[in-house]
């Protein structure tokens, strides 16, 4: 048996079913091209019979993608198969994926037929699909709850009819790994023509076991895993592609299996899908979460500085990230602070480590995470260790035109002790407020991230806005709290403005320090 596991991505079909709004054809094509770069073997990109829009997107992707096999879904109905075949006909290579329910509850309650009738429909659908392509996949929907005798009969009949891939879905995420592995093993033991098809699995995450079930399945002989980027999909989602790829890569010595995935594209693809689907990735998500390669414990950070594999079983570079993160918090030791200062180009002779660490702990206790620009200010600006409020927002007034979408904001802001008042328009109240603040401060920054949340519960909750902005190629993080979201946004921007002002002062100090070094060396 081959040790190569086929990766079948269904982000654009099953994954899209989780979205509040459908993706456009252009957005689907962007994701499809990213999946091709990622190296998926098969991409299921839609259900052509469901709508003209789905038909168009499947056809557009089929015409464009060259290095992955494009697949479309169809029920075990001729009209569905016709639509799939027509949409896919422009592709160099394609697969038709047809399915029917096989569990007792589905057969009796949903289809209202006998199992023998359903088996006959399945065989007919596979034979009909084979008129258009040799690459036909058949799925036994809700296989995880199908009586094993019926499942064996269905699989044998579908293979005999011409299916070259047989998919065993745990449609409702019901099984546990030992149970699901036993289903796959039983099929291999009891279906006489099983060697004529690739056994695939499609596991849902209702009990959080989709990845575990999929890995167990390939240990028992399955050689295709159906999955999605970031695990998005119906209800609790699908098996996560990035987790499967990195499990098989990281534990290759134990599992003896491999994929064709270009892991260095994982992070980029995950970000693209998250942005286009408007589905943020949870911070603690395996492989692609913001905290996946972040270390805050002082003990862990110490180990990481001595040897990276003490607390990392894979490198961030392996999925396309530049490096891991050692978050500077009150749990960070002196060695981490020294390491960060060295990375920023400072020798231990440039600052007093005892004083710096003492001030660092005070600031970390107050604000949680300390950033590089905070550390520099603590090291070289003693009196400015607290945030330098060069800018202070005194008043914000916003007027919006609900019909035109244009807003006007007027700000009164203190700039180095001088009161300035400016007004500006914008595409909405937040944009107008930002434009007015930029005029008043004459300081331009680029906002690359804006997150809106709440602090507190119920009527007493405050709006919290977190922004990340770029200034002189460095990222700065600002937070604003207020009962009004627009005011919270303005306060977050002013917070960033003050951080950049302080960074300018640190830069001036560094420049003078460098000049003194040069003069001392003459």
From Swiss-Prot:
It catalyses: 3-methyl-2-oxobutanoate + acetyl-CoA + H2O = (2S)-2-isopropylmalate + CoA + H(+). Its cofactor is Mn(2+). GO terms for molecular function: 2-isopropylmalate synthase activity; acetyl-CoA C-acetyltransferase activity; manganese ion binding. The keyword Metal-binding applies. One of its GO terms (cellular component) is cytosol. It comes from the Bacteria. NCBIfam families: leuA_bact, PRK00915.1-1, PRK00915.1-3. Catalyzes the condensation of the acetyl group of acetyl-CoA with 3-methyl-2-oxobutanoate (2-ketoisovalerate) to form 3-carboxy-3-hydroxy-4-methylpentanoate (2-isopropylmalate). This is 2-isopropylmalate synthase. It comes from Shewanella sp. (strain W3-18-1).
């Amino acid at each position: 048996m081959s040790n190569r596991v086929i990766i079948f991505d269904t982000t654009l079909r099953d994954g899209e079913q989780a979205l509040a709004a459908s993706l456009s054809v252009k957005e689907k094509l962007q994701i499809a091209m990213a999946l091709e770069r990622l190296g998926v073997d098969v991409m299921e990109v839609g259900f052509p019979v469901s709508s003209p829009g789905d038909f168009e997107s499947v056809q557009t992707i089929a015409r464009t993608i060259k290095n992955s096999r494009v697949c479309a879904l169809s029920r075990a109905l001729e009209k569905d198969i016709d639509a799939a075949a027509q949409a896919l006909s422009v592709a160099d290579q394609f697969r038709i994926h047809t399915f029917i329910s096989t569990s007792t509850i589905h057969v009796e309650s949903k289809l209202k037929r006998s199992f023998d009738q359903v088996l006959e429909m399945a065989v007919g659908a596979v034979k009909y699909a084979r008129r258009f392509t040799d690459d036909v996949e058949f799925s036994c929907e809700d296989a995880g709850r199908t009586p094993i005798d019926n499942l064996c009969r269905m699989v044998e009949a579908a293979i005999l009819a011409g299916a070259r891939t047989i998919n065993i879905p745990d449609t409702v995420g019901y099984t546990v790994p030992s149970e699901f592995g036993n289903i796959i093993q039983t099929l291999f033991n009891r279906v006489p023509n099983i060697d004529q098809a690739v056994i695939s699995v499609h596991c849902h995450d209702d009990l959080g076991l989709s990845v575990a079930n999929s890995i167990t399945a390939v240990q028992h002989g399955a050689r295709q895993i159906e999955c999605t980027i970031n695990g998005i999909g119906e209800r609790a989602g699908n098996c996560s592609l990035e987790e499967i790829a990195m499990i098989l890569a990281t534990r290759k010595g134990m599992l003896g299996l491999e994929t064709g995935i270009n892991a260095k594209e994982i992070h980029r693809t995950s970000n693209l899908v998250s942005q286009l689907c408007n589905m943020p990735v949870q911070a603690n998500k395996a492989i692609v979460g913001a905290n996946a390669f972040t270390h805050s414990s002082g003990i862990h950070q110490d180990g990481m500085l001595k040897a990276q594999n003490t607390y990392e079983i894979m490198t961030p570079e392996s999925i396309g990230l530049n490096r891991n993160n050692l978050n500077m918090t009150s749990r960070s030791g002196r060695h981490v602070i020294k390491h960060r200062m060295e990375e920023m180009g400072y020798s231990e002779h440039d600052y007093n480590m005892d004083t710096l660490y003492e001030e660092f702990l005070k600031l970390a206790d107050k604000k949680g995470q300390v950033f590089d620009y905070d550390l520099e200010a603590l090291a070289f600006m003693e009196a400015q260790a607290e945030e330098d409020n060069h800018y202070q927002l005194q008043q914000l007034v916003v007027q919006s035109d609900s019909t035109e979408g244009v807003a006007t904001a007027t700000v009164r802001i203190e700039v180095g002790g001088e009161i300035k008042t400016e007004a500006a328009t914008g595409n909405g109240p937040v944009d107008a407020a930002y434009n007015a603040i930029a005029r008043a401060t004459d300081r331009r920054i680029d906002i690359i991230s804006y997150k809106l949340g709440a602090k507190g519960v119920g009527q007493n909750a405050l709006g919290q806005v977190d922004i990340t902005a770029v200034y002189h190629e460095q990222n700065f993080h600002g937070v604003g709290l207020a009962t009004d979201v627009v005011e919270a946004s303005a306060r977050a921007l002013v917070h960033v403005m003050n951080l950049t002002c302080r960074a300018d002062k640190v830069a001036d100090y560094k420049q003078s320090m460098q000049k003194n070094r040069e003069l001392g060396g003459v």
